[in-house]
Amino acid sequence: MPQKRKNRAKTSEVGVRDRLLDAADRLFYREGVRAVGIDRVLAEADAAKASLYQHFGCKDQLVASYLERRTVDARANIEAYLADTPPSQRALKFFDWVVAWAQSKDFRGCPLQHTVSELTDAAHPARAIAHAQREWFAERFREWTTAAGVKDPKATARALMVLFDGAVAGSEVDGPQRASDARWLARKLLAG
């Protein structure tokens, strides 16, 4: 999701926890959570190993915190993007947001899907965060399709969720046109 976060300098003004999360965000999203070792995060954050353990305990908690921060940012960005949109039009407007995200220069697909695909532990704390975010999206789609007055809002919401998944995955592989295609299909679904 588009991340609107100020670039933070490596200064004492920025807390070490934030520097660690900023570094993890850049590296994990770009390269993956398994490809990036703790030493790279520490070097990028200009932080000591003890700081990582003090703030996160272990890499798994850093990964979970990275995803948690991404979900909080995504929700805030989506809500801000849709704030002036009537509820009945939010489902379609959401796909405009997806198109803008897919067209952004740093787009690399869904951080949730990428991270979860790398996790072998079913009990990893990041999995619960990813699941909660997907539930949040599902609930938004149900709200938006109900407000849009479609014949079967629950089924339409599920279909829009599948379109969203396909738009993000397809845009990563084929380019942002897949997000535009998904928006076109969403308009058809919502029109009945």
Residue ranges and their predicted role:
Residues 28, 37-38, 49, 59, ...:
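Amphipathic alpha-helical segments enriched in hydrophobic/aromatic and basic residues
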Residues 1-31, 35-47, 61:
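Basic, helix-initiating cap at the start of DNA-binding domains
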Residues 104-125:
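Amphipathic alpha-helical segments used for helix-helix packing
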Residues 21, 92, 135-142, 183, ...:
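An amphipathic alpha-helix signature
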Residues 20-28, 98, 141, 164:
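Short hydrophobic clusters on alpha-helical segments that form packing/core surfaces
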Residues 65, 78-108, 147, 157-160:
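Hydrophobic alpha-helical connector segments
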Residues 125-132, 146-190:
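Hydrophobic/aromatic-rich alpha-helical bundle segments in the mid-to-C-terminal region
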Residues 45-56:
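Short hydrophobic/aromatic patch on the recognition helix
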